[in-house]
């Protein structure tokens, strides 16, 4: 029985050793995969960062252009309002002057008639 026990214990020790080796191997492989993944992520970030910055600059330029166009449009609207107001005032003044001149002409005509 002792020989069978020895063989069983030896087999158990062999299995235990193989399990430990497998565990260590898996841990090493896991660490390698993790490091490769981190390196890949870093590479992707490094590649994407300049492109993202360029896109951000372009978006800012577009936003600045839109803001400038809005300001220009608002200024044109204000200028148009001022011109319209001036035209209305001028028309009113002209109408008043025209009415005054008509009355004056009538008075002059009545004096000479």
UniProtKB/Swiss-Prot annotation:
UniProt region (Disordered), positions on chain: 1-96
N-acetylserine modification, residue list: 2
Residues annotated with Phosphoserine modification: 2, 25, 40
SUPFAM superfamilies tied to this protein: Apolipoprotein A-I
Biased composition (Basic and acidic residues): 17-37, 53-82
Cross-link for Glycyl lysine isopeptide (Lys-Gly) (interchain with G-Cter in ubiquitin), residue positions: 18, 23, 29, 34, 45, 57, 82
Positions where Phosphothreonine occurs in the chain: 49
Coiled-coil intervals, chain numbering: 2-97
One of the GO BP terms on file: fungal-type cell wall organization
Superkingdom as given in the UniProt entry: Eukaryota
Membrane topology: Peripheral membrane protein
PTM section of the record: Phosphorylation of Ser-25 is induced 2-fold in response to mating pheromone.
Keywords of the record: Acetylation, Cell membrane, Coiled coil, Isopeptide bond, Membrane, Phosphoprotein, Ubl conjugation
Cell compartment(s), UniProt: Cell membrane
Disulfide-bond pairs as recorded: none
Skewed-composition ranges (Polar residues): 1-16
Cellular compartments per GO CC: mitochondrial outer membrane; mitochondrion; plasma membrane
Main location: membrane
Oligomer status and interactors: Interacts with MID2.
Entry function: Acts antagonistically to MID2 in signaling cell wall stress to the PKC1-MPK1 cell integrity pathway.
Protein name: Protein ZEO1
Organism in which the protein naturally occurs: Saccharomyces cerevisiae (strain ATCC 204508 / S288c) (Baker's yeast)
Species classification: Eukaryota, Fungi, Dikarya, Ascomycota, Saccharomycotina
Encoding gene, per UniProt annotation: ZEO1
């Amino acid at each position: 029985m002792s020989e069978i026990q020895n063989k069983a214990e030896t087999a158990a020790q062999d299995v235990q050793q193989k399990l430990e080796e497998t565990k260590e191997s898996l841990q090493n492989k896991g660490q390698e995969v993790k490091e490769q993944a981190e390196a890949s992520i870093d590479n992707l970030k490094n590649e994407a960062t300049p492109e993202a910055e360029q896109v951000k600059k372009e978006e800012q330029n577009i936003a600045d252009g839109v803001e400038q166009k809005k300001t220009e449009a608002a200024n044109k609207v204000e200028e148009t309002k001022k011109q319209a107001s001036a035209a209305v005032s001028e028309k009113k003044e002209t109408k008043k002057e025209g009415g005054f001149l008509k009355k004056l002409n009538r008075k002059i005509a009545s004096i000479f008639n």
